A protein has these predicted regions:
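Acidic, proline/glycine-rich low-complexity IDRs
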Residues: 3, 11-15, 76-83, 87-138
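N-terminal "first-domain core" detector
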Residues: 1-39
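Generic recognition of long tandem-repeat/solenoid scaffolds
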Residues: 28-37, 53-58, 105-117
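Short linear motifs in intrinsically disordered
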Residues: 22-23, 43-47, 96-104
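Intrinsically disordered, low-complexity regulatory segments enriched in Ser/Thr/Pro
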Residues: 39-80, 121-138
C-alpha cells in the first residue's frame, strides 16, 4: 500500500489487531489482508483505492468505505475512513456482521438485521463460519 492513507491504515491495523495474522502485500495492487477464520468465509482484504477503502471478503462480497464529506481536509477524511474501517473489522471479528452470497450477488449487514432482499439459495456467514439457512432463504 502506498500513500499516507495506507501508511496510517497499516499502523492502526497492526496496533488494533496484533494477533489476527495481518499480512501486508506490496506490488502493483498493494493490499492488506487477514487470514480466514473459516475456509468457507475466506480472507478479508483491504485495498486503498486512493480516496476510499475497499473491503473484500474472499469471493463472498465486497464493499466500499468512502469519505462522508469530500470537502473535509485530507487528514480528517483519512481519519474518518480509517476509524470506520476499524469499527467494521472489530464487528466482523466479533461475528457481529453477517455476510451473504447468492450466485453473483452478495452483501453484508449487521447480525440480526433483516437483509435488503431475499434471494433463492442464499448462503449466510459470519467471520467464524457458515450460518444455518432460515426458512425465508429456501
Amino acid at each position: 500500500m502506498t500513500g499516507t492513507l495506507s501508511e496510517k491504515l497499516i499502523a492502526r491495523l497492526r496496533a488494533r489487531f496484533p494477533n489476527r495474522g495481518l499480512r501486508i502485500h506490496e506490488g502493483k495492487e498493494p493490499v492488506a489482508s487477514f487470514p480466514a477464520a473459516h475456509p468457507e468465509v475466506g480472507d478479508i482484504r483491504i485495498d486503498d483505492d486512493g480516496d476510499e477503502l475497499a473491503i473484500s471478503v474472499a469471493e463472498l462480497t465486497h464493499g466500499h468505505f468512502t469519505p462522508r464529506d469530500y470537502q473535509l481536509p485530507s487528514q480528517e477524511k483519512e481519519e474518518d475512513l480509517i476509524e470506520r474501517v476499524m469499527r467494521f473489522l472489530e464487528q466482523v471479528f466479533d461475528d457481529q456482521v453477517e455476510f451473504w452470497t447468492a450466485g453473483k450477488a452478495g452483501g453484508w449487514h449487521g447480525r440480526g438485521e433483516k437483509p435488503i432482499g431475499c434471494w433463492p439459495n442464499r448462503r449466510r456467514f459470519v467471520w467464524s463460519g457458515p450460518l444455518p439457512a432460515h426458512e425465508e432463504d429456501s
